[in-house]
Amino acid sequence: MSSAPHIPVLGREAIDHLAPREGGIYVDATFGAGGYSRAILDVPGTRLIAIDRDRTAIAGGAELVERSAGRLTLVEDRFSHLADVCAAQGVDAVDGVVMDVGVSSMQLDQAGRGFSFRLDGPLDMRMGQAGPTAADVVARASEADLADIIYLLGEERHSRRVARAIVADRQETPFTTTRALADLVGRVVRSKPGDIHPATRTFQALRIFVNEELEELQTALTAAERVLKPGGRLVVVSFHSLEDRIVKNFLAERSKTGGGSRHLPEVAQTAPSFQLLTRRPVVAGEDEVAHNPRARSAKLRAAERTSAPAHKDDQSSSWPRLSDVMRGG
């Protein structure tokens, strides 16, 4: 199974922490090019449910499905739906969940997908084929909403300046290509030699917003909590601070005892649903970064499910919501 050339970021470390065993049932929540899936299937007798919302990734995995002799089920869906996907396959509990969140190298390298400011293509950015594109958001969102999106999801301190320029320019010519938007941001955000590309944060913000990536991640983590068996493992690789903060806070909350107090003994305590396997995030070594610069920002966190019930789901957030912005546009 391991003959494919694709090697995922922190692939060895992810599989070491997942620790797949013979006969176990696992979920690769973000199939992509199938790197984690191949490593899991290398363990004899494993059963794997792999998920991806990108139809191109699903098509690319057809050969692996055929070679797996019934051990791999590949499903086109959002990874936030992993509990429902498992239930549809007759699986109510699994031994491990691994997820590599964010945009994939394959998606970035395809100009037609519109993810990259370095390649000219349609301003799309959708991981799936449904919903508004980045061009739709840029065309319809108010200046205030655009500024919030770019600031909160891209951590761009010049967000208001960028939003103002977008709204001014779109009245003359709609933004339909990645190059047009990247050029505008490049004129508005000044950079020095050695800085990241001026459009990096704006493109990140629009991509996260269009795909609802932070909401997806939060929901996927709680879904994994529900389907993991006691002793089952959750492994998450993230690529920027917003994602890592969500994973870190989720695991910190789920790995501590909460709710009770010696002053209020009648308040029931919530037992930890996870035990941390990584007190600090695992990062890529120098050799991996040299071969794959994208690995520089990767952080891996892992935890093991306890026998305690899943915690109450709290989905509150302060992020701009796609449905709200597009409804008001």
From Swiss-Prot:
Region Disordered: start-end pairs: 285-329
InterPro entries on file: RsmH, SAM-dep_MeTrfase_MraW_recog, SAM-dependent_MTases_sf
Any GO MF annotation of the entry: rRNA (cytosine-N4-)-methyltransferase activity
Function text: Specifically methylates the N4 position of cytidine in position 1402 (C1402) of 16S rRNA.
EC number: 2.1.1.199
Protein name as annotated: Ribosomal RNA small subunit methyltransferase H
Gene: rsmH
GO cellular component terms, A-Z: cytoplasm
A GO BP entry: rRNA base methylation
PANTHER family reported in the protein's UniProt record: 12S RRNA N4-METHYLCYTIDINE METHYLTRANSFERASE, S-ADENOSYL-METHYLTRANSFERASE MRAW
Family classification: Belongs to the methyltransferase superfamily. RsmH family.
Catalytic activity of the protein: cytidine(1402) in 16S rRNA + S-adenosyl-L-methionine = N(4)-methylcytidine(1402) in 16S rRNA + S-adenosyl-L-homocysteine + H(+)
Subcellular location: Cytoplasm
Record Pfam families: Methyltransf_5
